[in-house]
């Protein structure tokens, strides 16, 4: 499950725990103080967040050998996408909850899998 270059789930979990602890070490700034003090705290917090993001990318790239950029997924043309309105939208009080279902013809990317 974990990865591309034979890395184990345990390696992935270690990396995730490390990245999580980095983000938890930088809580959002407090809202007290003058406007200038709050602005300075937010500025310093954003800079620390950028540093943590760079460290996280380095961990994923170096330790796990992964790129941070997602793999491009080939999507079908928009003309082939339809919304299924035959399903009930829910009972009163829950209308609009959830996501609409999208029906898609199987693109060539998905057809390369196991045949039945």
UniProtKB/Swiss-Prot annotation:
Please indicate the residue ranges that the annotation assigns to the motif Nuclear export signal and binding to XPO1: 73-84
Please tell me whether the keyword Amino-acid biosynthesis is annotated for this protein.
no
Comp. bias intervals (Polar residues): 88-98
Identify the domain of life.
Viruses
> What is one GO cellular-component annotation here?
host cell cytoplasm
Listed disulfide bonds for this chain? none
PTM comment, free text? Asymmetrically arginine dimethylated at one site by host PRMT6. Methylation impairs the RNA-binding activity and export of viral RNA from the nucleus to the cytoplasm.
Q: Please name the GO terms that the record assigns under molecular function.
A: DNA-binding transcription factor activity; RNA binding
- Compartments where found: Host nucleus, Host nucleolus; Host cytoplasm
Q: Which residues carry this modification: Phosphoserine?
A: 8, 92, 99
Motif placement: Nuclear localization signal and RNA-binding (RRE)? 34-50
Q: Can the keyword Transferase be found in this entry's annotation?
A: no
Family, similarity comment: Belongs to the HIV-1 REV protein family.
What is its biological role?
Answer: Escorts unspliced or incompletely spliced viral pre-mRNAs (late transcripts) out of the nucleus of infected cells. These pre-mRNAs carry a recognition sequence called Rev responsive element (RRE) located in the env gene, that is not present in fully spliced viral mRNAs (early transcripts). This function is essential since most viral proteins are translated from unspliced or partially spliced pre-mRNAs which cannot exit the nucleus by the pathway used by fully processed cellular mRNAs. Rev itself is translated from a fully spliced mRNA that readily exits the nucleus.
HAMAP family in the cross-refs: REV_HIV1
Protein name, per record: Protein Rev
The species is Human immunodeficiency virus type 1 group M subtype B (isolate RF/HAT3)
């Amino acid at each position: 499950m974990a990865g591309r270059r034979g890395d184990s789930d345990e390696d992935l979990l270690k990396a995730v725990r490390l990245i999580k602890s980095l983000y938890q070490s930088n809580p959002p700034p407090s809202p007290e103080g003058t406007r200038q003090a709050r602005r300075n705290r937010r500025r310093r917090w954003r800079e620390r967040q950028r540093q943590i993001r760079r460290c996280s990318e380095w961990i994923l790239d170096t330790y796990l050998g992964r790129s941070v950029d997602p793999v491009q997924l080939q999507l079908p043309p928009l003309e082939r996408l339809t919304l299924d309105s035959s399903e009930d939208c829910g009972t009163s009080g829950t209308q609009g909850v959830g996501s609409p279902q999208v029906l898609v013809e199987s693109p060539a990317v998905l057809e390369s899998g196991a045949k039945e």
